[in-house]
């Protein structure tokens, strides 16, 4: 038990340190890309959403890609749940066949996208102001030059995603 507490404290310390250092040295979207990469370690998807064991774990970007090549670079060669992690870019919600984490960058259109994805096990992420209110799961926001998270637990439950308590500790819960 003591080892578990030390491990949890170390993970939380690492995340806060990463946030602070990256906010100072990296661009805003590099920090957000790091989060997208790491979200997969703090959520559980139902096995049916993961598909066959040989299928990749897909991080998607819908709309304009603000990450450049950075997200591709940090995910190259990485595995999530023994699956290769791949980044895919989509111009339309209708182009998405399989996606596990989706960053939505379609200002003013996220509500329509979220309605289309409702009930599917996709972690939806955006930095749009009303994202959580519209049914999005994780919203990035800035607080004193630090990237923070706001999580809509009802939306996560609707998507059949289990959010780790470790992630919840560093996030603001949307109510």
State each model region's role:
Residues 2-10, 21-175:
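Short hydrophobic alpha-helices and adjacent helix-cap/hinge residues
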Residues 13-19:
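Sec-dependent N-terminal signal peptides of Gram-positive bacterial secreted proteins and lipoproteins
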